[in-house]
Each structure stands twice: as structure tokens, then as C-alpha cells.
Amino acid sequence: MNRPPLPLAAHERLIFALDVPGHDEAIAWVDRLGESVAFYKIGMELLASGEYFHVLDALAKRNKRVFVDLKFFDIPATVAGTIRRLSQWPVSYCTVHGWHAGMLEAAAAANQGDMRLLAVTVLTSMGRPDLAAMGIDREPVDVVVERALAAQAAGIDGVIASGQEAGPIRRATGPAFSIVCPGIRPGGPVGDDQQRTVGVAQALADGADAIVVGRPIRLANDPAAAAAAIQAEIRAAVVPHRD
């Protein structure tokens, strides 16, 4: 079953990538950012700390939305069991790899809560040469749209994909499909490991429901001010068909 996109308020469209090594650092960032961020993505580094679900619980108690970004990829039964358990937690988004239709169908069937499942299409750190090295000699946008349509057909609620592909995905899948875009660079490309990046306004105008921002906030001289500036961009770029 495809769940409709989350009814996000404008300030919830900014998701901060909480890429830190442990619970104390995570909560320090939440306190530092305060009201400027209402949605947090927690990923593999926190999982390795052994404090992952303590952080998830702490975020929920602070009335923050949570995006579990662990990119599950295993046999269908294993992924289904994981999603079934995770859907009992206060999680808004969760990622699964979008490479296997049977696994996606099992994950969708196992989702028993309000959590939205997002299929990983092509990582934003990858370009065409990277795909070619994997035996996929095609443009990233073509692979992304193909996987988005396959995920939608399998009952997955949306995708996580570069903002460069938000428009083609939205045109292919229609309005009732979630698109979350990482690799957002408010000030333009900065020469890091992200290859397929766009700005805030472009991602939202092209159909993104939410954007993920990490280093542009984390490395700023004033992270809360940087997040507030992005929130101002979001408010100025509200897309009518999503509100």
C-alpha cells in the first residue's frame, strides 16, 4: 500500500543529518539548533555507537520527527521483520534499498504504522562513471526514475534521490508519492563527496517534499542561524501542490 506523503508543515521540510558518533553529541546538536530544526535524520554512525534507539527516543520526547536512514538491504523475510518492528517506533521516514522488487514488496507489506518507506535510488555521491563501473552504463536520472516507478509499483511510499532528479520523478510518479532530497547545498557546490547537488528552492520547486542538509549547517560558524536561513528559503519556496 502506498501511503500518501506526510502532511509536513513548512518548518518540517528541513531535515538535519545528525551524523555524530554518540548520544551526547546528538542531543547537544538538538539543543544547539533548538526551534530552527524539527526533523532529524539518524544513520549508520549512531547505530555503531550502540545508542541509536536512545537517540530516537530522546528526539521523540522533544517532539522532533525522526528519519531512520539505515538503507536496509537483505532477503525479503529479514527486511520485513525489521520493518515490522521499526514501524512500532515513532519514525516518520525509513530507507530501504530500491534494488529488489521482492524485498520492497515485503517491506511495504510489513509496515504496520504511519512510517513512510523511502527507496534508495542512486546515492548522491555517485555519477555516471560510478554506475558504469557497476555494469549500469546509463545516466543516473534514467536509473533513478526507473527505480522510483518500481518502488511505487511495489507499494513503497516514496524515494530518496538527488534534487536533480526530483522533477523527473514527480512527473513520472504523480503527486501522491514522497520525494526526499539529500545533498542539498544552499550556497552551491562545495567540492565534497556529493556529486549530484542542488539548492533549496530548486529541489522544492521540482517536487521535493523535504530536503536533507548536513554539512552546510554543521560546519557553519553559527549552525542555528544557517538552519534558520534555510527555513526562510523554504518558506519563500512553498510549492502549492504540496500544501
From Swiss-Prot:
Transmembrane segments: none annotated. CDD domains: OMP_decarboxylase_like (cd04725). The active site is at residue 71. GO terms for molecular function: orotidine-5'-phosphate decarboxylase activity. It catalyses: orotidine 5'-phosphate + H(+) = UMP + CO2. SMART domains: OMPdecase. Keywords: Decarboxylase, Lyase, Pyrimidine biosynthesis. Substrate binds at residues 19, 41, 69-78, 124, 185, 194, 214-215. GO terms for biological process: 'de novo' pyrimidine nucleobase biosynthetic process; 'de novo' UMP biosynthetic process. Pfam families: OMPdecase (PF00215). Pathway: Pyrimidine metabolism; UMP biosynthesis via de novo pathway; UMP from orotate: step 2/2. Its EC number is 4.1.1.23. InterPro entries: Aldolase_TIM, OMPdecase, OMPdecase_AS, OMPdecase_bac, OMPdeCOase_dom, RibuloseP-bd_barrel. GO terms for cellular component: cytosol. HAMAP family: OMPdecase_type1_B (MF_01200_B). Belongs to the OMP decarboxylase family. Type 1 subfamily. Homodimer. Catalyzes the decarboxylation of orotidine 5'-monophosphate (OMP) to uridine 5'-monophosphate (UMP). This is Orotidine 5'-phosphate decarboxylase.
